[in-house]
């Protein structure tokens, strides 16, 4: 469809939605709010001023939930509460990088544990971590740490657990950012020690986004959970750490709910499902005689550049109100058909996540010695699909690339 956002229709949308306003910034400005930051940082930066208000009970469509905010944990409280702790970041991938730098910038005592002289070790040095002072091999970091933040990949956690487990001694805290290893313990063989707090903080975004939003003084939404509370302080510890690593708003969940919703989301609307829908529509348009440019524009470009940002900022109803009456009528009429078709697939997906089939598939694939080669091959196949080749050209024609 065409995105017919005339002045008349914009005013109608404004009347429909009350005081909310149409986004006026260019898409390039919107994109900058989620852009990946540079991987090089100064050794330390001053933590940005956070705009927060405290814990409150909020009504989510009739269900009341507690939501914690950063103001419960100002920087001074964080530093005092964790003054006797050493946060050991195990793994320096996406989450290790973002969470580690944020906690360090909050003034906490943070060290990093990775394989010596590997790519992550070298990246950590570039980011200001000092070998022998704040950067150590994994086992040494665990011995030195009091809060062990296991941010390795799921497959790597399974592989390294036999060596890590004996080092997580009484009095330490075991921290995860994903419930995978603990909930699917029959496959991962990860059984946390009985005499330590086991907690989870799961940022709702990549580690790069965690870092970017922190540097902008905002903060990412995160969930927290307690699997095992030995000290009686596991919950407050989890919330404090959530703030320390850059969270703005923090929601309570369980390890099981976190991992199931996460895996379903990634395979569904967030990545797999939307990719499948993009491909299906593009292929139908091409098979029916439309050009690659037209098919891509009506499938991906208009969605990501015009419509999805409005949904993210104001909601689906606002996006509908900003479009033509013809577009709205068709969207509303066809929604039940797509809902019916997709619920069947999503229920099948949920079952496969809940019964451990997806965990088994993930561990087997990502533990294979040649998994990187297989993964690169799959990405290359995606990259070479006509839809994304056409997309490269369409993106090059965006206004921000053609300033004269």
Curated annotation (Swiss-Prot):
Encoding gene per record: ilv5
* Protein's pathway: Amino-acid biosynthesis; L-isoleucine biosynthesis; L-isoleucine from 2-oxobutanoate: step 2/4; Amino-acid biosynthesis; L-valine biosynthesis; L-valine from pyruvate: step 2/4
Provide the Gene Ontology terms for cellular component: mitochondrial matrix; mitochondrion
Residues at which substrate binds: 324
Principal localization reads mitochondrion
Please list the cofactors this protein needs.
Mg(2+)
Residue numbers bearing the Phosphoserine modification: 261
Could you tell me which species this protein originates from? Schizosaccharomyces pombe (strain 972 / ATCC 24843)
What is the protein name given in its UniProt record? Probable ketol-acid reductoisomerase, mitochondrial
